[in-house]
């Protein structure tokens, strides 16, 4: 007769094994491989959405969920309360849950009557917790004790915990917490970007060398701890190797051990990883970080060494397994005790497999399938014919950002306007340098690197006047910051600035909209930028890492590529407007998170203006005309910026307009107040602040943007759920509720499938990262979010912490995803990508793009298509 141990270990643990084969590697390779468990974390000023599991996509979503539950006790499936709330709102169709359960049962092997199993599963899927009275009952615990031999064999665990996590000092403090305290301190010192006027000594030599010089003087360490590090190696790699050796970590366990340390502070480790990817000087920074961390761990735990078992043993808990059959399977304790060992083994093995993760996985999939079905019905009921379209009066290209969807919908209803969706950097791989700035900012998705630098230029005299005004403004800020950071002047600063800042506090608090508008207009007047041009022509400057401007071929190529990507190669309107987007908020560390994700946390207006300027160049139009893309003479390209917080369109580039273009411009201007009113009303009514009809939506939106006490100026990209790639006619009359990324695509102009592949590789990846950033911050806010905005501390100019000694918080704040303390606003669904194209196009894409195919197969994104006849297919 097969024992219960063999049933559980052979049949069940196969599902749980998420380990990856680890071959012997040198230390550089080990650290690089271990870095898969964290994601790069951008500084908050250039906040870029990232999904925290980007290095783990070779494993399935389910495997990563199981592994994180074992490794860090982190749940990445929606909680029971989220699921119950979604079901109550009609967001989950019960039939999808039942079909999902049937498929799962069909895939399992068990020797229990199907009806009995289904009854157990149906009860368990109610997601009720087992009663504590049952779990603690003496009778149940006695039954479990009779089967205690099961616990002699622990579960296989692919995660090696840091040695410090198993040890407590005499005060009862876990040594891993003490280690984290030290590491946070050293990370803040080294990474500090603007927080102090005194920098870390020897910082230019790298983190490890700087730490090595100072650690012997650290008063926070005991004399014995400092003595361990007294003659410690000066080379980070040697030190890391030695520390691992003295801790007794075997060669086969090294990568798992390094992963455990990276996951201990994923925020600081993520920032270190990001820095290591930015320059060759810091490319070994992650090794240095681990060398510092594990060297300090050795110093702290050495008095306690050796410890017998460094692996986290997660023994099989028999009590809840028996309790689950008693509570959900209607089996009495008497009946259980009368069962044979084989019957008990079968029931326990099944209960172990049908664990909480599986139950919540089935609910998540039902939630996602319900959303897909609802989207399918919206699209199929609203499709319009694409033939014989009249020439639109104006065409406006917006970013794919979900916040563009309501604005576009209301705009199209109010006039003969056609809108397009395109990535907000408009296909221009540029670093932008605004007028008078010595620095440049990559203005493209963070997954790409800039290939050109574009500088803003103006008349020399105008430039001098502008610089003088700007210098006055910057000198005030610089003086304030210097006084604030200096030991002596910081004592005087409150006396000097108190009256002015006190007045600002009062006025900002009680009349935020008026004061904010006044200050904004005052600043705009003082720093009025003169008319500018761009350095569009190619210049080879040896001082710059990337060339300035474009060659003629590059100008034509970028314009052609963007126009073809959205299918705009004919029937041009008299006015074509490229609309970047930006946000507007006050006293908001996360301001960059509300900007354009396609522009690396910056506004998209600069790119829009550059692209529109390129489209108006005669040389570009002539070259495009020779290729069959004929832009009429009366068609003028302009640029604007969609202000998402107030839903307004701000014009930033209006060249001389033709008569028909002027008519189009006037028409847009005439409807814009109504568009703003409708879009603002729709958006504001979703905020928890409003329960009744809003009298003046635009006025309220401006108050939200200017109020420095407002913790939620807008929802950002919350509730994003789908990325629709196709012609606008597919979704034109659909109310997509601001939940869909929209990218125009015409498969008839993409014979090779290359355009579709580019959309998936670029905007598709950006949308997926944004989606999973919101997902992670919702389902595991304590680990992947950043807590409550009101208690955050901006630290080192890099990011936020809770208090002064927490991890650098990697995700979105509570206010970005939660409606209230108990109710989420964001629906944690994995991104559904819908492509309007024949089936063969999707097959070609999946066959040629291994990375995307892996994402789909492993459950990181969902994929559906709509063929030319309107038939929907799930892939």
UniProtKB/Swiss-Prot annotation:
Statement: the UniProt record of this protein carries the keyword Nucleotidyltransferase? no
Q: What InterPro entries does the record tag this protein with?
A: DabA
| UniProt keyword terms in alphabetical order | Cell membrane, Membrane, Metal-binding, Transport, Zinc
Main localization of the protein? membrane
Q: Which GO terms describe its molecular function?
A: zinc ion binding
How does the entry describe its membrane topology?
Peripheral membrane protein
Q: Which GO terms describe its cellular component?
A: plasma membrane
Entry cofactors: Zn(2+)
Q: Where in the cell is it found?
A: Cell membrane
**Residues that coordinate or bind Zn(2+):** 399, 401, 581, 596
| A Pfam family this chain is assigned to | DabA
Claim: ATP-binding is one of the keywords in the record: no
The record's HAMAP family line, in alphabetical order, gives: DabA
Family as reported in the entry's similarity comment? Belongs to the inorganic carbon transporter (TC 9.A.2) DabA family.
Which proteins does it associate with, and in what oligomeric form?
Forms a complex with DabB.
This molecule's function is given as:
Part of an energy-coupled inorganic carbon pump.
Protein name, per record: Probable inorganic carbon transporter subunit DabA
What is the species of this protein?
A: Bacillus thuringiensis (strain Al Hakam)
Lineage, please? Bacteria, Bacillati, Bacillota, Bacilli, Bacillales
């Amino acid at each position: 007769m097969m024992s219960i141990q063999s049933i559980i270990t052979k049949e069940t643990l196969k599902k749980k094994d998420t380990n990856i084969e680890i071959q012997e590697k040198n230390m550089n390779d080990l650290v690089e491989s271990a870095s898969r468990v964290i994601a790069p974390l951008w500084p908050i000023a250039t906040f870029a959405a990232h999904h925290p599991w980007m290095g783990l996509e070779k494993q399935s979503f389910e495997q990563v969920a199981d592994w994180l539950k074992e490794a860090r006790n982190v749940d990445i499936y929606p909680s029971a309360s989220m699921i119950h709330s979604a079901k109550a709102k009609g967001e989950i169709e019960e039939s999808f849950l039942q079909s999902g359960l049937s498929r799962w049962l069909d895939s399992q092997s068990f020797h229990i009557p199907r009806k009995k199993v289904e009854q157990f599963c149906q009860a368990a899927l109610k997601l009720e917790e087992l009663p504590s009275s049952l779990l603690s009952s003496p009778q149940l615990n006695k039954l479990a004790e009779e089967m205690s031999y099961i616990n002699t064999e622990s579960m296989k665990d692919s995660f090696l915990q840091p040695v410090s996590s198993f040890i407590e000092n005499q005060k009862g403090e876990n040594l891993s917490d003490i280690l984290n305290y030290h590491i946070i301190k050293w990370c803040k010192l080294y990474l500090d970007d603007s927080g102090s006027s005194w920098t870390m000594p020897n910082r230019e030599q790298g983190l490890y060398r700087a730490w090595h010089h100072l650690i012997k003087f650290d008063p926070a360490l005991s004399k014995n701890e400092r003595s361990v590090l007294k003659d410690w190696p000066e080379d980070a790699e040697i030190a890391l190797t030695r520390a691992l050796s003295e801790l007794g970590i075997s060669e086969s366990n090294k990568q798992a051990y390094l992963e455990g340390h990276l996951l201990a502070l994923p925020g600081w480790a993520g920032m270190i990883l990001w820095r290591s990817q930015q320059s060759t000087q810091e490319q070994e920074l992650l090794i240095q970080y681990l060398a510092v961390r594990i060297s300090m761990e050795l110093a702290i735990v050495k008095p306690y060494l050796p410890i017998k078992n460094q692996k986290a043993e997660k023994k099989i808990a028999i009590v809840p397994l028996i309790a689950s059959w008693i509570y959900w399977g209607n089996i009495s304790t008497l009946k259980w005790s009368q069962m044979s060992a084989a019957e008990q083994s079968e029931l326990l093995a099944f209960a172990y497999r049908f664990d909480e993760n599986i139950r919540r996985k089935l609910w998540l999939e039902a939630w996602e399938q319900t959303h897909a079905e609802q989207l399918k019905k919206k699209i199929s009921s609203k499709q319009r014919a694409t033939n014989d379209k009249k020439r639109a009066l104006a065409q406006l290209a917006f970013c794919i950002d979900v916040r563009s969807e309501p604005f576009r919908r209301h705009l199209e209803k109010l006039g003969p306007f056609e809108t397009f969706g395109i990535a907000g950097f408009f296909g221009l791989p540029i670093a932008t340098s605004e007028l008078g700035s010595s620095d440049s900012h990559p203005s493209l998705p963070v997954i790409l690197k800039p290939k050109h630098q574009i500088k803003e230029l103006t008349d020399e005299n105008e430039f001098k006047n502008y610089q003088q005004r700007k210098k006055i403004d910057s000198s005030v800020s610089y003086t304030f910051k210097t006084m604030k950071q200096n030991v002596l002047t910081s004592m005087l600063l409150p006396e000097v600035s108190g009256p002015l800042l006190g007045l600002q506090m009062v006025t900002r608090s009680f009349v935020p909209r008026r004061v904010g508008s006044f200050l904004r207009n005052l600043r705009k007047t003082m720093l009025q930028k003169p008319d500018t041009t761009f350095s569009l022509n190619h210049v080879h400057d040896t001082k710059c890492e990337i060339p300035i401007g474009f060659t003629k071929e590059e100008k034509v190529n970028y314009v052609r590529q963007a126009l073809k990507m959205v299918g705009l190669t004919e029937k041009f309107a008299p006015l074509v407007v490229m609309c970047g987007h930006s946000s507007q908020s006050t006293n908001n560390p996360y301001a960059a998170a509300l900007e354009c994700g396609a522009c690396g946390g910056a506004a998209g207006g600069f790119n829009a203006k550059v692209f529109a300027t390129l489209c108006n160049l005669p040389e570009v139009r002539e070259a495009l005309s020779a290729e069959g893309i004929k832009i009429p003479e009366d068609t003028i390209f302009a640029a604007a910026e969609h202000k998402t917080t107030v839903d307004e369109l701000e014009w930033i580039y209006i060249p001389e307009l033709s008569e028909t273009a002027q008519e189009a411009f006037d028409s847009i201007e005439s409807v814009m107040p109504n568009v703003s009113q409708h879009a603002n009303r729709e958006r504001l009514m979703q905020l928890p602040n409003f329960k009744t009809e809003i009298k003046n939506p635009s006025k309220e939106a401006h108050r939200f943007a200017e109020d420095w006490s407002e913790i939620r100026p807008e929802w950002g990209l919350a509730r994003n759920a789908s990325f629709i790639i196709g012609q606008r006619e597919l979704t034109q009359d659909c109310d997509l509720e601001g939940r869909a990324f929209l990218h125009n695509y015409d498969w008839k102009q993409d014979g090779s499938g290359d355009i579709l592949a580019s959309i998936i590789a670029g905007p598709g990846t950006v949308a997926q990262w944004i989606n999973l950033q919101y997902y992670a911050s919702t389902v595991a806010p304590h680990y992947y979010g950043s807590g409550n905005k009101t208690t955050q501390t901006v630290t080192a100019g890099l990011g936020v912490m809770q208090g002064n000694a927490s991890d650098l918080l990697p995700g979105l704040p509570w206010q970005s995803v939660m409606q209230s303390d108990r109710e989420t606003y964001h629906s944690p669904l994995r991104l559904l990508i819908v492509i309007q194209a024949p089936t063969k196009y999707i097959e070609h894409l999946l066959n040629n793009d291994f990375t995307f195919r892996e994402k789909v197969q492993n459950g990181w994104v969902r994929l559906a298509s709509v063929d030319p006849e309107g038939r929907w297919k799930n892939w």
